[in-house]
Amino acid sequence: MRTNKLSILLGNRATGKTIYGKSLIRAALKSGKAVLVVDTFDHPAYAALQRITPDAIADIRPGECVRCYGSDIEAILHGCTNLYNALLVMEDATKYIYGTITDDVKQILFDSKQKNVDVLMMFHSWTACPPAVFRVADNLIIKKTGDNCEVRKKDCPNFAEVYKAWETVERSADKYVTKCVKLQ
């Protein structure tokens, strides 16, 4: 299955971002894609996955589900530029993608379609996700963030739909409520 979508998942702590991400992982594996989970630390939710080094990212095979984590996030992101035919889950991207995005992150984002890579980037808030990421994303998955989506009004394609979804999420009593909006 070839979708090659870049998705942003926004949500505060304990709103179910990782659970949502794991559901996408299951779907990717079912379709035969490889999966790579990237993080800066040994996230307990992914403890069962084999850990690989950044230089092994290019060798991930269809149907494999692995993780790469550590403090040298630059090496990990550079390794991700060699990923093909996979789902790339960027767990807690708030910690390593911010401000002006790096050349490696640009390459990951802009080459994803040619490399058959779906990308899921998880951020804690609207302000934590760089404006450039909003401008190129295909999908926005909204959970409770506690901040206002209007800070990204100029950066979000399809903002009227985004605002409606955000309003629904923030007004809900369900702390796990999720709304998805197609941006492109």
Residue map of PLM features:
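Phosphate-binding and hydrolysis-coupling loops of NTP-dependent motor/remodeling domains
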Residues: N148-Q184
